[in-house]
Design a protein with these regions (language model features):
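PLP-dependent amino-acid enzyme catalytic core
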Residues: 1-240
Length: 240
């Protein structure tokens, strides 16, 4: 991730656009004590009946609807349509406010689906988003990412990005995937020179199937921004 000192002044125009186009439309706490505590609250769905029916049919339990009420959060209905909208908004707002993310930069991130869908919102700000995905990603998710304008890089790796999945693969295979990655980035309009200059490190990360740190590395060499969702404390703090 870029150091804050590189960009001491935030991009005020981008921050203003973020607040109007994104923050105002997603669930967030209201700072005005005279207004509702939560703005754009996540819709709740009453799941009591199906849960009680499941308890009766599957477990032989008879539970009265008078003694329990079960509600589910319907995250697909909020702006951004993903359970990861809140952490994505927090992380990107912090990045813009501290000068780490500015107009013209590209967001790079490894995703198994939900966080990538949330990042699609930021296309409204004119920011490019490149998601590193694996071929195991559900077809519907891939189509939605494309619909949202997220640029996809298929690493052709049989894992979903997740912490700790650093499995060694054949060096020849890693080199082949690296070349495929290089071609895909070129097709997305990125200069191949930064890739070529750091190819050894890219191949090392691919050999370990370390998609998370690969996203961080690409953001660094291309002067972009990586939310680092798996290591970012805001990803946890937003749910507290």
């Amino acid at each position: 991730m870029q150091e804050p000192s590189q960009f001491p002044e935030p991009d005020r125009d981008l921050l203003r656009k973020f607040h109007g186009e994104i923050k105002a439309k997603v669930p967030h706490l209201n700072q005005d004590a005279s207004a509702p505590a939560v703005v754009n609250a996540t819709p709740l769905v009453d799941l009591t009946r199906p849960f009680l029916e499941c308890a009766r049919v599957e477990y032989g339990l008879e539970v009265s609807s008078k003694s329990v009420k079960i509600l589910g959060k319907f995250d697909s209905q909020i702006f951004g349509g993903s359970v990861k909208v809140r952490p994505a908004v927090q992380i990107v707002e912090n990045a813009i406010s501290t000068g780490k993310l500015r107009t013209g930069q590209t967001i790079f991130e490894a995703t198994s689906g939900n966080f990538g869908l949330a990042l699609g919102m930021f296309r409204r700000l004119g920011l490019d988003v490149i998601a590193l995905v694996s071929r195991k990603l559900q077809e519907g998710v891939l189509e939605q990412l494309k619909k949202d304008g997220v640029k996809l890089v298929d690493l052709d790796i049989d894992i979903c990005p997740a912490p700790g999945l650093n499995l060694d693969m054949n060096t020849v295979v890693a080199k082949s995937i690296a070349e495929n990655l290089r071609q895909q980035l070129g097709q997305l309009g990125l200069d191949k020179s930064p890739f070529d200059s750091s190819r050894a490190e890219i191949e090392r990360l691919l050999a370990r199937q370390d998609v998370i740190n690969l996203a961080k590395h690409l953001a660094k060499v291309y002067g972009g921004f990586c939310p680092e969702q798996y290591d970012n404390e805001l990803n946890v703090a937003v749910h507290e």
